[in-house]
């Protein structure tokens, strides 16, 4: 597998032999990675960094529909299967099974994101933001731990915030046969994924921060700017 092949295949793995890995890291050295859980403030931090420091932002969530349209069910099996589930189907499974399925989904989505990055011309620093940034995969793509950061919302904060995120949450739950059970399994799944992200980032020596709502978003963005090495500006 060559680097040119990686660039040509949206779902191609960015992890291969040593020569390919080195070339991929070189081509992505301008990329910063901001991952983490739902309700952790990733998108707001990215927006503030873009405004204060001029960094371009790639939102994995915003790319989802485009990737969904380009996905090959024979190649991106988990991405297509999980992405096509209705809420009632998604949350009907036990939380542990949901978490396992979602990690496979995120892994395939991340490879599609990497495909986009490899096809893009390198330039000014680019901040990639999204829940699909799995620590072990990102670790293979960076030259320095300072290129990556994960924000993980605490259980209590995430559950409180989800209930205030707007009518779309209630609408999704209303489509389920057992709305209360669906919400509980949804939150339990996210608890499992949060613990997993923390353990993985810690194991790999990568930075993760707990978000409980006690820090103003401006302060969180300023701390993220310092982590990534931005100077000056006001977040």
Each language-model region and where it sits:
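ATP-dependent small-molecule kinase phosphotransfer cores
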Residues: 66-125, 132
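Phosphate-binding P-loop
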Residues: 21-29
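Walker A/P-loop
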Residues: 43
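Short beta-strand-centered segment that lines the nucleotide-binding/catalytic pocket of NTP-utilizing
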Residues: 53-71
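A glycine- and Lys/Arg-enriched "phosphate-lid" helix/loop adjacent to the NTP-binding pocket
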Residues: 146-193
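ATP-binding Walker
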Residues: 37-40
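Hydrophobic anchor at the beta1->P-loop junction of P-loop NTPases
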Residues: 34
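NTP-dependent small-molecule kinase module
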Residues: 3-4, 9-13, 18, 192-235
